[in-house]
A protein has these predicted regions:
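Charged, flexible cofactor/metal-binding loops and thiol motifs
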Residues: 122, 126-129, 133-134, 148, ...
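Short, well-ordered beta-strand elements within core beta-sheets of diverse protein domains
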Residues: 43-52, 171, 241-249, 374-381
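A helix-coil-helix interface module used to build multimeric assemblies
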Residues: 1-206, 211-218, 280-281, 292, ...
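Short, exposed beta-strand "edge-strand" segments with a Pro/Gly-rich flavor and a Y/T-containing core
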Residues: 49-53, 82-83, 115, 205-211, ...
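Glycine-rich cofactor/substrate-binding loops
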Residues: 1-37, 102-103, 270, 285-458
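A general structural motif at alpha-helix termini
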Residues: 64, 220, 265, 276-278, ...
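A short structural micro-motif
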Residues: 65-73, 234-237, 394-399
Length: 458
């Protein structure tokens, strides 16, 4: 069996292919972040030791030019990671060494691929969480616009999928918006846990030299470095599963919106109308217009959850310290993020096309939907609730069908159809937008300053 020479030694060809796996493809997502973390690490090396720095100012400036060039090549899809490179880290080191000789050989001083990839993944996660909150806000805003526009349109409220009580389109749409507002809090919680820099923890056990981990953490826009160097590496996989757990909550909200739309756009209901260009057809049935988008979102909510659980299962029995098992967490991590963002984007576009069929909404009401309203009228007249309940239950056929537009006007308490406080949604949305803007600007400023080149998250 033949071997091939790599930066870390001679490896059998078959072993190399097996161990590299899909990293030559997956690691393309990490190229920018590996360049960014390398710049921060090199800046620290420029400070150590003070009397004779490992990297000179001139070398650092030359390095920045090369790292920005690699980022540009990657954005143009021209940067290549070969199997012999094994991963993005060695591919970049090889290119820097080819261009700058000794400088490239110095870059791995005090650094392991273990803390290197952990840092890259956390940088990627910062960017993707910011983007996820941003697109979540877009969907929230579209739902609130739709809700306010149709706030007084009556809609049969359902429990167990059967008609229950008078409700409104405004209540339905804003309920889903409120769910997503809570999901944004979950995303920010994951962001806070992720916002710690593992760089400098090396292979899990630190290095015998007083490096400045606070410096690299600050340069990269993290709120702080991870403390324990062993946990810095042990947290890999755990942090990714937490991030996907927050995204699973987003997908749970999207799945329920999708399911409602699938039901309420059926001809039997015809409550809502989706733009024709958001529907697909059948290869054999000419009349079909299918809301495949919502069916796929419903299924993809399970896909994202499975990505989260895949990562959890990979790391749950791993011993302390780095283990190659972690390589298998990349694909589900990237897939879960991409799926969540794409579902948010497509559903936002769909909501903006959504129309309400008011007449069909009103026709859906029958007298029994007002059973609870009638029961509470009798209570207001002096009858005990249970007696009123039994009286109405025993005389359902005698109930009168009233105008649902008038019925929902009686529900004025906090959070009811006519008691919705629209400023509540404005305040919460603005709070999230403000926090998002702060994190986005801080991250962009830090990375732009480090690279001496403009960097945009979104």
């Amino acid at each position: 069996m033949s071997s091939i020479k790599t930066i870390v030694g001679n490896i059998d060809n078959t072993v190399l292919s097996f161990t590299v796996g899909n990293d030559v493809v997956l690691d393309k997502k990490l190229v920018d972040f590996d360049c960014i973390s390398t710049a921060a690490h090199a800046y620290m090396l420029m400070q150590l030791p003070k009397n004779n720095p490992i990297i000179s100012k001139e070398e650092f400036n030359s390095l920045l030019i090369s790292l920005n060039k690699i980022i540009e090549l990657n954005n143009e899809k021209k940067f290549k990671i070969k199997e012999v490179d094994q991963d993005v880290h060695m591919a970049i080191e090889k290119m820097i060494t080819k261009e700058h000789g000794e400088l490239g050989k110095k870059l791995h001083t005090f650094r392991s691929r273990n803390d290197q990839v952990a840092t890259d993944l956390r940088l990627l996660a910062k960017k993707e969480l910011i983007k996820t909150v941003d697109v979540s806000l877009s969907l929230i805003k579209s739902l609130i616009i739709f809700a306010k526009k149709n706030k007084n349109v009556p809609m049969v409220g359902r429990t167990h999928m059967h008609p229950a009580m008078p409700s409104s389109v405004g209540l339905w749409a804003s309920a889903h918006a409120e769910s997503l507002l809570d999901d944004c809090n979950c995303l920010f919680s994951a962001y806070e846990l992720n916002d710690q820099c593992p760089l400098g923890s090396a292979a899990s056990y630190g290095v015998p030299f007083k490096i400045d981990r606070n410096l690299t953490s600050s340069l990269l826009g993290f709120s702080k470095p991870t403390h324990n160097v062993l946990y810095a590496n042990n947290s890999r996989g755990k942090v990714e599963s937490i991030i996907l757990s927050s995204m699973s909550q987003v997908m749970l909200s999207l799945s329920r919106i999708a399911q409602d739309l699938l039901i309420f756009t059926m001809p039997e209901f015809n409550y809502f109308k989706v733009a024709d260009n958001f529907l697909t057809g059948s290869s054999i049935m000419p009349q079909k217009n299918n809301l495949d988008i919502c069916e796929l979102i419903r299924a993809k909510s399970s896909s994202v959850k499975s990505c989260e659980l895949a990562i959890y299962d990979i790391v749950k029995s791993a011993p302390s310290g780095y283990n190659r098992d972690l390589q298998e967490t990349k694909q589900p991590f990237f897939e879960g993020i991409l799926t969540t963002i794409s579902c948010l984007e497509i559903l936002t576009s769909l909501i903006y096309t959504l129309k309400v069929n008011k007449n069909d909404m009103i026709k859906a009401f029958d007298s029994k939907v007002f059973s609870t309203d009638r029961t509470l009228e009798l209570v207001a007249e002096g009858m005990s609730f249970r007696d009123a309940y039994n009286h109405v239950k025993n005389n359902l056929d005698d109930l009168k069908n009233i105008d649902p537009r008038e019925a929902i006007k009686n529900k004025t308490h906090l959070g009811a159809p006519y008691g919705l406080d629209w400023s509540y949604y404005t305040v919460r949305t603005n709070q999230i937008s403000k926090k998002l803007k702060k994190e986005k600007i801080n991250f962009e400023r830090k990375i732009s300053k480090l690279l001496d080149s403009p960097y945009k998250v979104i």
